[in-house]
Amino acid sequence: LSVTRKQCLELGMVLSLSPMGTYLEGTMGCLQLKHGHGGFVIHNTTQLRIHFIQGKDAILIRMPKIFLRLQSATSLDNQNVRNEFAWLEQTFKRRAYGQQSQSSSIILPEGKGSFWIHWITTQDGFCGLPLVSVNDGHVVGIHGLTSNDSEKNFFVPFTDGFEKEYLDNADNLSWDKHWFWEPSKIAWGPLNLVEEQPKEEFKISKLVSDLFGNTVAVQSRKERWVLDAMEGNLVACGQADSALVTKHVVKGKCPYFAQYLSLHDGAXQFFEPLMGAYQPSRLNKDAFKKDFFKYNKPVVLNEVDFNAFEKAVEGVITMMVDFEFAECLFVTDPDEIYGSLNMKAAVGAQYKGKKQDYFSGMDSFDKERLLYLSCERLFNGEKGIWNGSLKAELRPIEKVQANKTRTFTAAPLDTLLGAKVCVDDFNNQFYSFNLKCPWTVGMTKFYGGWDKLMRSLPDGWTYCHADGSQFDSSLTPLLLNAVLSIRCCFMEDWWVGREMLENLYAEIVYTPILAPDGTIFKKFRGNNSGQPSTVVDNTLMVVIAMYYSCCKQGWSEEDIERRLVFFANGDDIILAVKDEDVWLYDTLSASFAELGLNYNFDERTKKREELWFMSHQAMLVDGIYIPKLEPERIVSILEWDRSKELMHRTEAICAAMIEAWGYTELLQEIRKFYLWLLSKDEFKELAASGKAPYIAETALRKLYTDVNTQPSELQRYLEVLDFNHIDGCCESVSLQSGKETVENLDAGKESKKDASDKGNKPQNSQVGQGSKEPTKTGTVSKDVNVGSKGKEVPRLQKITKKMNLPTVGGKIILSLDHLLEYKPSQVDLFNTRATKTQFESWYSAVKVEYDLNDEQMGVIMNGFMVWCIDNGTSPDVNGVWVMMDGEEQVEYPLKPIVENAKPTLRQIMHHFSDAAEAYIEMRNSESPYMPRYGLLRNLRDRELARYAFDFYEVTSKTPNRAREAIAQMKAAALAGVNSRLFGLDGNISTNSENTGRHTARDVNQNMHTLLGMGPPQ
């Protein structure tokens, strides 16, 4: 920064443009200042007190008292707009410095922005030079930008009243320090997103484009439903392909549990009052907008007591140091990074599929390369596109009825890998300090962990519990910057890692989020739920808020340690204070609100059992506190099914058993249901293979209390165990090709029929070879003589060579052995059905043109099949087809489906015949349902509704009555329909030459004579 005599301010402040701010953001080292009074050095730039000038690309730096005060500059007033101005450049050489003056120019306001325009010639390195009035020598602004398209240059002007507003009011300004990023660093826009997309190694599937950059668009409907409703503190910055995912992990009510309740009245009376309290979250557009727009609140300024806040942050750092929180490392080992990834999660907004599929074909070198590139992106401050979606989960019925569903903001892979390098080691050490420091992150609630937590709250004190409302979206940049400062304090000294860490938290606050309507939004506050350190960061911010609240009341660090006990986990917090300090609870809500947090501390009690923390309540069992969920929440595990396999269902029931321990009656009822379930045939095989675990009472007691089981308790299990039981599933089976033959295969065994017929049959008859009705004997011979003879009933061959078979040269051209075994499925041979290859080609083409994955195509195929049931599969259909999303119609173009259907759409849809028939039958089981095809044909018999669609495939199994109805409906549909092979050819000339010769005697132009008749008189 070039500093001139006219540029320096009287109150010991230096004015700087964003290049200076960027320099301060990226360094912990020295700052050198040179001017006419000598040179100055500031060794730690993070200790500088900085004020951001609102609406201007400039900052004020308040210098230490040792910095010499200099002559002040005056501001621009409106009368000087037409005056000419020049600038001064002061060059500092090794031994001398000189002052140079450049050419002059008039200046004009730029318009709506914060810059003014001048036309003085510039070159690189001139940023920061002052513009000086030629008339009076006053500094009126500082040069900042040059235009790439014209000769214009831009400078930041001193506003009217600058001296009064800033210089004379210096003590009342908000002077900030410890800022590791500032507005110029994070003022990215659409251009940054487009230029900073991941490199080809990341194999992205979706590209970011400018929101309003496309002048040509496909005329299919693309509704920007999030953008249209956006308002407040959010900015749209780009667009990319996206869609609202409405597929829920909760498949519906558990059919086994419903059947069990219908068969057992006692169980139904017990469970029904506890059911219905939780339901699957709603995944719709209004729910997304309702939760996502929590980010649009402005950041409130001038409410925080910065002295108390800085003291609070220092107090948290001191507390962690006192508990020997050690230096943390930047983890660059690829095996550690990839080993801790959730491979079942999605890759990111610009990618397709899950991580396990994405990494399946990569070797160790490819993975290490991706990690390096992710770190490089983070180091350069390049932003990844985060994905905003609705969270599919069970929620309280009140939240569901209010259409409140939580949004989830997931980090993309190109940011996630580098982020884990920065935060993983700190997080792991943070987990290990649970209950030592005032947090429970990393604590297990089992093995007496909850008892240890409750006992940490002193006896006789007044307890309180609270959790934050709209916590993630209410977090301010100030709090997240404080978390960054704590992390920087404990991280190893590596300048590359430090730059990555600072840029990561700049991205966390000022995040580009891809909404389901395809719009990319930039937010300016709040944490992201899908970043790799969400819980740790949220917990740290709650701890800072508690220290801040106490510091505002004048408490020292010793007072906090002696008079207050609290534990935080995410946005949850429990506290304990002495009775004489209960007044502190009355001040906490206001102090938290100053930091932007919405908390209520009215829930107070003297009993630990009445505290709620992380959705758990303490219960005293045998002198030990154990954590308990609400009974309704445990029953919801039984009520709702999210399993993909039978084994997953048994695991869910076992989880409910574990959570129910302590609720004696509830646990007993769950065990009864589990016993009934294992008696069903499909679960018997599962139990026989050891995949249906049994959880003993002794195991649950050990799990919760960490008290070893006594031998006398185990003896009770030994008494009922059957040690003679043969492992495995043994059943007596028999072949069904011929009962008598099968029974007689056991030599020496006498059947019941043999015994009854003993006196009526000859005793020494021989059994003929191959006989189906062997003569009974007292003892059946083990071996049969190959030369023996007996009575035999002959069997005719189904196809013999005596038949009139096709021959060539006297030789049968058929393979009779193969023909006897060749029994293909009839429908696979129908030429009215598309071949499997044609069907696969159609499916793949539609999938590509719709740009969907297999999971999304499954939903689309469901919707299209149901649409075709009602609307038919005529090749003349065009326009759009619709699918319902709740009460909303979603339109899809028909063109990709019809054009790619070879041979015809109806032949393609014949593959859906059985599924469509089953769907109609299912709908009819719930309420009367007749497809539109049947309504148009006036089909009155609802029993035939299952055949009332035009792509039904008639097979040998189709009943005669149904075949007749189908034929009649087709005849009715085609009545009066004719088609022309050729239409009118409009390209043929109809002109012809008239070669007829006429004379004056002709009767008229078409007749020469009247053939003897006289002309009219």
Swiss-Prot record:
BP-aspect Gene Ontology terms: DNA-templated transcription; proteolysis; viral RNA genome replication
UniProtKB keywords: Capsid protein, Genetically modified food, Hydrolase, Nucleotide-binding, Nucleotidyltransferase, Protease, RNA-directed RNA polymerase, Thiol protease, Transferase, Viral RNA replication, Virion
Domain Peptidase C4: 1-195
Keyword Cell wall biogenesis/degradation: no
Coiled coil: none
Post-translational modification: Genome polyprotein of potyviruses undergoes post-translational proteolytic processing by the main proteinase NIa-pro resulting in the production of at least ten individual proteins. The P1 proteinase and the HC-pro cleave only their respective C-termini autocatalytically. 6K1 is essential for proper proteolytic separation of P3 from CI.
Catalytically driven reaction(s): Hydrolyzes glutaminyl bonds, and activity is further restricted by preferences for the amino acids in P6 - P1' that vary with the species of potyvirus, e.g. Glu-Xaa-Xaa-Tyr-Xaa-Gln-|-(Ser or Gly) for the enzyme from tobacco etch virus. The natural substrate is the viral polyprotein, but other proteins and oligopeptides containing the appropriate consensus sequence are also cleaved; RNA(n) + a ribonucleoside 5'-triphosphate = RNA(n+1) + diphosphate
Positions of the UniProt region annotated as Disordered: 746-787
Family: Belongs to the potyviridae genome polyprotein family.
Protein name: Genome polyprotein
Organism: Watermelon mosaic virus II (isolate USA)
